[in-house]
Amino acid sequence: MPHIRQLCWVSLLCLSSSAVAANVRLKVEGLSGELEKNVRAQLSTIQSDEVTPDRRFRARVDDAIREGLKALGYYEPTIKFDLLPPPAKGRQVLIARVTPGQPVLIGGTEVILRGGARTDKDYLALLKTRPAIGTVLNQGDYDNFKKSLTSVSLRKGYFDSEFIKSQLGIALGRHQAFWDIDYDSGERYRFGPVTFEGSQIRDEYLQNLLPFKEGDEYESKDLAELNRRLSATGWFNSVVVAPEFEKSRKTKILPLKGVVSPRTENTIETGVGYSTDVGPRVKASWKKPWMNSYGHSLTTSTSISAPEQVLDFSYKMPLLKNPLEQYYLVQGGFKRTDLNDTEQDSTTLAVSRYWDLSSGWQRAINLRWSFDHFTQGNVTNTTMLFYPGVMISRTRSRGGLMPTWGDSQRYSVDYSNTAWGSDVDFSVLQAQNVWIRTLYDRHRFVMRANLGWIETGDFDKVPPDLRFFAGGDRSIRGYKYKSISPKDSDGNLKGASKLATGSLEYQYNVTGKWWGAVFVDSGEAVSDIRRSDFKTGTGVGVRWASPVGPVKLDFAVPVGDKDEHGLQFYIGLGPEL
């Protein structure tokens, strides 16, 4: 019986405490700005059902408020508690009335730097961030300053650094605070030799990927860049490059060890897709990310749709002196086209030399050979071409698969001459630009411009793949794919020697990953610029930022065209740049 009575009393006390807690609300008055924000952060650990009017809880709140104020230089606040009766159908309110009091001011910030830090510009720059004498103490500034010293040491290779002394002195009677820091960075480490384990690629190729030389001063960004460059080659499944500290304490020369594992030798990918331009499409590819110890790689692919069937390959050969940014590319393939008034069988082979520059620009010179049998309208021809060319391009983006900012630029010149065996003389100049900009997160603008010019004395021998046609998803919407060009006397498309198209599209973020779009496209594909024939299409669309890239659905109509009146729709998936 006594035990039962005790249990009953305990149960009643718990129920009573819970009932009181559920009927009391805590309120803090007298603070604003950063003081209020910091105190609220200290009190955030208190749950609403923990609030009670008893002395123990008040002491807990008192401690939390003092800690929050102390961090910002207020060491002597006055805190008074009042318990207000509940309003009608409300709860009791426990009010903490706070007077912050006189703040503690910075009286001095003595920082002594030893070792390499005495002359290192990054450490010296930190000294300028110390608070001015007479400003209110903020303990966060002191803690962050110490963290910054440590951060510079780790970033720049002062791995023996230590605080000989670090003290924040408070003289409450004078309401002053004093920094007293004595920091020895020690000697800066330098990069030593780099060794690799597990690589199937020759060591000299890997050594030429290093963004630093042996003996250079250590920088953590250089180590991160080496990891990035090794991954960017596509040769490895995993890459880890780490310092070997145990071998460097005496000499301050830091060797690095890279542990890599080869990527799978063969990768096969298949896919089924649909685009309005070519309809349903089946794709397959076979990739060999490395074929030998020189890092050569091979990609073959095929794409089959009703109007186009393509089989091609690409063989990449990195150069020893700069394997990531400089390489040869051998490309070739076969393409069969039966679209509108074009029938073509084309076999191509090209050898290109690439330079990928640190600025983001890519440069290339190439030598192409092609053999084409084609019928364009009523004209049938067979041509063999052998022509060099140059190309420069750059793509930049920020914001993931559906960029908030970005641009893509590509400029090329190709030249063919019968003097070296081509069947036709020509010069081809092309420029393609895409720009993406976003304002205030919800307003997205996509602008496109394409220009092309063919100069030749025998246009009928130029293969359709080199001629210009407009119309379609990435050209002038409202018109069918490649349906705009000059026509012959029978009304068949001939292709054009001049191209100019542009597009302006505005997208608005309706909700989440969904965007609405309105656009206008305009341009022409002509052979005589004196006979301008601009076409314009306009429409609306929907965009979904899917995990694999933007999915689009557009509806467009021609504007002011007496021959074209129908509604065209476009479905697509893929990058906009």
UniProtKB/Swiss-Prot annotation:
Signal sequence annotation: 1-21
Source superkingdom: Bacteria
Keywords: Cell outer membrane, Membrane, Signal, Transmembrane, Transmembrane beta strand, Virulence
Keyword DNA repair: no
Phenotype when the gene is knocked out: Significantly reduced survival in human serum, probably due to complement-mediated killing.
Keyword Membrane: yes
Subcellular location: Cell outer membrane
InterPro entries assigned: Bac_surfAg_D15 (IPR000184), BamA/TamA_POTRA (IPR010827), D15-like (IPR039910), POTRA (IPR034746), TamA_POTRA_Dom_1 (IPR035243)
Coiled-coil regions listed: none
A cellular component term, taken from the record's GO annotations: cell outer membrane
GO biological-process terms attached to the record: protein secretion
Pfam families linked: Omp85, POTRA, POTRA_TamA_1
Function recorded in the entry: Component of the translocation and assembly module (TAM), which facilitates the insertion and assembly of specific beta-barrel proteins into the outer membrane.
Quaternary structure (record): Interacts with TamB to form the translocation and assembly module (TAM).
PANTHER family, per database record: SORTING AND ASSEMBLY MACHINERY SAMM50 PROTEIN FAMILY MEMBER, TRANSLOCATION AND ASSEMBLY MODULE SUBUNIT TAMA
Name of the featured protein: Translocation and assembly module subunit TamA
Gene name per UniProt: tamA
